[in-house]
Every structure is written in structure tokens, then in C-alpha cells.
Regions:
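Structural micro-motif
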Residues: 17, 149-151, 162, 166-187
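Thiol-/selenol-based redox modules, centered on thioredoxin-like
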Residues: 176-229
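Structural microenvironment flanking redox-active thiols in thiol-disulfide oxidoreductases
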Residues: 101-164
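Short loop/turn microsegments at loop-to-beta-strand junctions
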Residues: 63-64, 86, 183-185
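Hydrophobic beta-strand positions
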Residues: 67-68, 188
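N-terminal targeting signals for export/organelle localization
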Residues: 1-65, 227-229
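Short active-site neighborhood of thiol/selenol oxidoreductases, capturing the structured segment around
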Residues: 76-106, 123
Length: 229
């Protein structure tokens, strides 16, 4: 039989360990919420289609501007795309798992809006891997996923890319094997260059999840789609 003092010490140790885990988890979640709240409204969207991929409305602040290089070696400045709705995602040029899902959802969502709408929407990806920054890397990834002429996949020096991550509060770290661990975030920027919505891709191959994510993005894109002149 355990001595009462020993049992008391064990219970106290367990309580301390549990409390420590709660504090660590709470701190991590608090940091994540602080990062996510940069331009969100105080009340998350109540639209179920937005919740399909964690989409939330933003306050409409101007999207931070930047200049990078696309898969063809052309310089692209974000603000030069005004007049089009921009769907902006962060894609790892070496990723073979979650990033292809994000890219496929972007492409399919745009296609579902029809040919007339497609001419008023720009799909833009920023390279989320500062360890694979070459134009050849983003071009090869675009070719491998059938997107070479369907979007702009932008890259730059590691310093330039990290600056964009910072501007958009996107967490991004490169692992020892060269893979990037980053927030799978997609932004919708309106024709006047203002941040309107953001979405987060679910790590799931479930067809119903992917369909829901696509529907959420279609709904958001349609909401801010410019009307034809």
C-alpha cells in the first residue's frame, strides 16, 4: 500500500504536469489567434460555405504590396493586378501533399465560375519554400500540376520571400529535409487591392471535404467578383 504522503506527491506532480501542458497549448493557440487576427473582423463569418475551409472575412485593408518573379522570369507586382480579383495562396515548390490540394481547389473553383468570370480572376501563388527559390523550381511545379499557363507562381530570393511571409503573417519554416512547414492560407483580394477573405486548406483527401473547400472558395470568389463592364 502506498504511503499517503507518497500518493499526495504523485497527485501533485500529475497536477503540475497537466497544468504545464495546458499552459503550453494555450500559449501556442493564443499566438496562432494573434497571428490570424491581423485583418479579421471581430466576428467570424457565419456563412457555412466559408467555414468549409475556415474562411473568415477581413477588414478590407489594402493587401501588402510586393514584387516577385513568375515562372516565366517576368517581374510581377501585386498592385499591378488591380482590376482583377486575386486569389493568393502560399505554395511550397517542393510539396507533394497539401499544396497540390490547395492548387487544385483554386483551379477548380475558378473553372466553376465560368469562362466570363475567369477573365476577371487572377490565381497567384507565392513560393512558400525559401530553400527552393529558383524560377526552374516554380516552373517545374506548375508543369507537373498542369498549371503552367493557368496561374502566376511567384518566387524570389529567400529574403524576398520571407518578407512576403511576414507581410501576410504566414508561418513558414523549412525542415531538415528541405520541406516547408507553412500555413496553407489562401487570400481573396478584391479589384481595388483590398483583403476580403482568407481560407485555410484542410489536410484531407476525403472527397466531401475537398468539395466543401471548393464550394467555400467559389462562394468567396463570387462575392468579390468584379462585374463585367
Amino acid at each position: 500500500m502506498r504511503h499517503p504522503d507518497g500518493m499526495h506527491k504523485l497527485a501533485l506532480a500529475a497536477l503540475i504536469a497537466t497544468s504545464t501542458l495546458v499552459i503550453i497549448a494555450g500559449t501556442a493557440w493564443g499566438i496562432r489567434l494573434f497571428t490570424m487576427s491581423r485583418n479579421q473582423t471581430t466576428t467570424p463569418s457565419t456563412n457555412p460555405a466559408n467555414y468549409a475551409i475556415g474562411g473568415f472575412p477581413m477588414t478590407g485593408n489594402p493587401a501588402p504590396d510586393f514584387t516577385l518573379t513568375d515562372q516565366f522570369g517576368h517581374s510581377v507586382t501585386l498592385s499591378s493586378l488591380r482590376g482583377h480579383e486575386v486569389v493568393l495562396a502560399f505554395i511550397d515548390a517542393r510539396c507533394k501533399t497539401l499544396c497540390p490540394l490547395t492548387a487544385q481547389i483554386m483551379y477548380d473553383a475558378k473553372a466553376r465560375l465560368g469562362a466570363s468570370a475567369a477573365g476577371r480572376i487572377e490565381l497567384v501563388a507565392v513560393n512558400a519554400n525559401p530553400a527552393a527559390t529558383s524560377i526552374a523550381a516554380v516552373q517545374a511545379w506548375s508543369i507537373n500540376h498542369g498549371l503552367l499557363h493557368q496561374w502566376l507562381f511567384l518566387t524570389g530570393t529567400a529574403q524576398q520571400l520571407k518578407s512576403v511571409y511576414h507581410l501576410y503573417n504566414v508561418y513558414d519554416q523549412v525542415t531538415s529535409d528541405g520541406q516547408a512547414v507553412h500555413d496553407p492560407i489562401t487570400f481573396i483580394i478584391d479589384t481595388q487591392g483590398r483583403e476580403r477573405l482568407y481560407f485555410e486548406t484542410l489536410d484531407s483527401n476525403n472527397p466531401s471535404d475537398l468539395s466543401g473547400e471548393e464550394l467555400g472558395l467559389v462562394t468567396g470568389m463570387r462575392q468579390w467578383l468584379p462585374q463585367p463592364q
